[in-house]
UniProtKB/Swiss-Prot annotation:
<dbReference type="InterPro" id="IPR000307">
    <property type="entry name" value="Ribosomal_bS16"/>
</dbReference>
<dbReference type="GO" id="GO:0006412">
    <property type="term" value="P:translation"/>
</dbReference>
<dbReference type="InterPro" id="IPR023803">
    <property type="entry name" value="Ribosomal_bS16_dom_sf"/>
</dbReference>
<dbReference type="Pfam" id="PF00886">
    <property type="entry name" value="Ribosomal_S16"/>
</dbReference>
<dbReference type="GO" id="GO:0003735">
    <property type="term" value="F:structural constituent of ribosome"/>
</dbReference>
<protein>
    <recommendedName>
        <fullName>Small ribosomal subunit protein bS16</fullName>
    </recommendedName>
</protein>
<comment type="similarity">
    <text>Belongs to the bacterial ribosomal protein bS16 family.</text>
</comment>
<dbReference type="GO" id="GO:0005737">
    <property type="term" value="C:cytoplasm"/>
</dbReference>
<dbReference type="GO" id="GO:0015935">
    <property type="term" value="C:small ribosomal subunit"/>
</dbReference>
<keyword id="KW-0687">Ribonucleoprotein</keyword>
<keyword id="KW-0689">Ribosomal protein</keyword>
Length: 82
């Protein structure tokens, strides 16, 4: 099954997440099919906290991809903010 979820990057105590489309059986930080955005929970000041390519997310959901709980919340918050 294809899922849209977060992969962790950054350094210790300063996480940075990529929003990726991947096979649900692959490891969290393993290979992915497509990168569709990023989430920076520690963004300060003018730094961009969240960027999502909603067209591509809707495309993958239309093909049957499942959103993880956290990504679903981010998509919902992004839609309200826009």
């Amino acid at each position: 099954m294809v899922t849209i979820r977060l992969t962790r990057g950054g350094v210790k105590k300063r996480p940075f997440y990529q929003v990726v489309v991947t096979d649900s059986r692959s490891p969290r930080d393993g290979c992915f099919l497509e990168k569709v955005g990023f989430f920076n929970p520690t963004a300060q000041g003018q730094a961009e906290r969240l960027r999502l390519d909603t067209d591509r997310i809707n495309h993958w959901v239309g093909l049957g991809a499942q959103l993880s709980d956290r990504v679903a919340k981010l998509v919902k918050d992004n839609a309200v903010a826009a």
